[in-house]
Amino acid sequence: IYFLSTPFISLSQKPNILWITVEDISPTLSMYGDSTAITPNLDKLASESLIFTESFTTVGVCSPSRSSLITGMYPVSIGTHQMRTGKDVFSWGSREYDGISNAIDVNGDSIPLHSVVTPPSVKCFTEYLRASGYYCTNNSKTDYQFAAPVTAWDENGNDAHWSNREVNQPFFSVFNFDVTHESKMWLHRDKPLTVDPKKVPLPPYFPDTET
């Protein structure tokens, strides 16, 4: 779904752009022809938006995909296609524990992880937006497989917001919601389901097992 926060602009104006991202979500939504989930707010947003029905990911895992989004490059062309690289790529800092600071190989040996060093010519597209006058904010996930340069964002963090820009300055603002992230799957396991699992259509590559 593509939605501009300024629907009617002249050719001489720079539109404000609000970019909302969610994670680990499939196109099982009504705007794509699926009626499993009831999502009236998303339906309303979709009715006012341009919907892409023929778009495909460059790689089927989060961080390499995110590196592609922020640079406009194929991950294999800039070395960000391996999942996962170093601890320094995380927006929440470099915490020291095996899940992030080291990888464990098949022999049980600890292998220090690394941050990809992209070619000098590769830039985050927000660097171009900032150069053209945009106020760019990210709230708040980066995780690009490489450390985001300081020139990528005017603000990057949990408090980042377009409201801090100069008067009449156009903005590009990202808000990342992780409520659909796979890691949140079990947070509500004791609550009633909102969808009957028996009514969820299975794609042909998912076997319909007894469990």
Question: What are these regions, as identified by a protein language model?
Answer:
Residues 122-123, 154-163:
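Short alpha-helical segments and helix-capping/turn motifs at coil-helix boundaries
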Residues 27-37, 60, 83, 91, ...:
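Active-site-proximal cap/lid insertion segments
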Residues 132-146:
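Short, well-structured beta-strand/strand-turn elements
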Residues 1-15:
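Bacterial Sec-dependent N-terminal signal peptides
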Residues 19, 26-120, 134:
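Active-site segment of extracytoplasmic enzymes that catalyze sulfate/phosphate-ester chemistry
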Residues 45, 126-129:
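Hydrophobic alpha-helical packing residues
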Residues 57, 66-67, 149-151, 184-188:
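Short aromatic-enriched loop/helix-cap "lid" or pocket-rim segments at secondary-structure transitions
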Residues 13-18, 48-53, 130-136, 168-172:
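Loop/turn elements at helix/coil->beta-strand transitions in domains of secreted/extracellular proteins
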